[in-house]
Amino acid sequence: ELGANLIVPHEALFWNHGDSREVVAGNETFEAKCALLDDWGGAVWRCHDYIHSGVPLASDGSMVDGIFYGFAAKMDWLGSAVDKSFMRYRIEPTPARDLAQALVHKLGLNGTRLIGDGDALVRNVEIPMHIMGRDNDEIAHIDSDDIDCILAMEFIDFTVSEYIRDAAMLGQGKCAIHMGHFNGEDPGMECMSTWLPAALGDAGAGLPVTFVPMGDTYQYVLA
């Protein structure tokens, strides 16, 4: 409908880290997706490491991770970032439930999961890199650096989630908001769609670049 002949996604097309076709050969969904792309006839460039490794978006022109810069911009937290990773923030004291609601509203989510103390007054916020089951370092870091709230892309019940819940029950005022991986990174790709034409210089003049949001990964069935 847009007439585009290049799609720039952030994550792999075929559900594995190296985007290997061999491991999914014969899979019905893989075959259908390939047929759809072949019928379309355009090109796909997976832009993952490039935008994470640094693009000149900071106010001083320095290189920053474009994905998390875009997240900070979407949340109106550019001025609250602790450093140029844009993964740690010092925000005005905010009740955890209010922060979760703000996240849902600003990212356009269907909802989110809140773990721990919903009444915690959140100041120190962090987006952990990944929570995938071997999370001793992350638990130690939350404790030693006095992190009030983590905004998790992935979440494992038997490690960080259990720790956050115990800390909250012991009155330590900690919480976690599980926003989802794609939901947290989508704003960075939206940011790229505005930056890309300028980055191309004269070649980008008049180039139509359209951001197409993925939409929330999750649907919620409530009690």
Regions from the PLM with identified roles:
Residues E1-A223:
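Active-site catalytic microenvironments in core metabolic enzymes, especially phosphate/sugar-handling
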